[in-house]
Amino acid sequence: MTRLSNAFAKGRPALVTFVTGGDPTPGATDAILDALVEGGADVIELGMPFTDPMADGPAIQLANLRSLGAGTKTADVFRIAADFRARHPEVPLVLMGYANPMVTRGPDWFAAECVKAGVDGVICVDIPPEEDPELGPALRGAGVSLIRLATPTTDAARLPAVLEGSSGFLYYVSVAGITGMQQAAQASIEEAVARIKQSATIPVAVGFGVRTPEQAAAIAKVADGVVVGSALVDLVARHGADAAGPVKELTAALAAAVHSARKEIA
């Protein structure tokens, strides 16, 4: 089993947490990632800062600007990832970002760097499966999971293309919009997850708009994992280099809610 498959094979839903690499500075990210693990996160998503994060809401857009303003480069993100892997050999780490930093030096180079840094998976926000002749094959060839996105507009005709070649988990974006701005109705999430699970052979994690333990617990009742990003990024914005404590506190509350959600209905 891989680190990612192990994270979803614990007999309970998984908590997936996101922060932007290099926010507020490359050096400060290490302690924030450690806080996520100490708080109980099962999977870590590390954002690759980009100048035009079109799928992200204000919180993560500002995180990208802070990171880039601190001088964060792609090499810094891989350094952060490699150091994380050395400290946490069993915790899955996923890079999330946009195509430009991933393909500028070639998909094969990017995939090789992922392997060297101990990265388990990659989420590329702006390359749909129909337009991915290079990055997906390069990652799969290197043994790195390619984690695709499904949305409320992913219908039965398109879902097979999204699932083909996907591994690790499927990320269901519960709202058609940008990150962190709103949460979808619980009924629509339940319907979508049930529909996707009829075809998917990998876990389904749900994100976008999840900010509180109560929201996370509701989703965890039906999904294999819950993704939380903007709420954690907001804490980094508020506390800067001192964010590790507040991040750990919120992560612990989220983890407790997600991990116990199924017990309430058992």
UniProtKB/Swiss-Prot annotation:
Its EC number is 4.2.1.20. CDD domains: Tryptophan_synthase_alpha. Keywords: Amino-acid biosynthesis, Aromatic amino acid biosynthesis, Lyase, Tryptophan biosynthesis. The active site is at 45 (proton acceptor), 56 (proton acceptor). The keyword Lyase applies. It comes from the Bacteria. It catalyses: (1S,2R)-1-C-(indol-3-yl)glycerol 3-phosphate + L-serine = D-glyceraldehyde 3-phosphate + L-tryptophan + H2O. InterPro entries: Aldolase_TIM, RibuloseP-bd_barrel, Trp_synthase_alpha_AS, Trp_synthase_suA. Gene3D superfamilies: Aldolase class I. One of its GO terms (cellular component) is cytosol. Pathway: Amino-acid biosynthesis; L-tryptophan biosynthesis; L-tryptophan from chorismate: step 5/5. Pfam families: Trp_syntA. PROSITE patterns: TRP_SYNTHASE_ALPHA (PS00167). HAMAP family: Trp_synth_alpha. The alpha subunit is responsible for the aldol cleavage of indoleglycerol phosphate to indole and glyceraldehyde 3-phosphate. Tetramer of two alpha and two beta chains. Belongs to the TrpA family. This is Tryptophan synthase alpha chain.
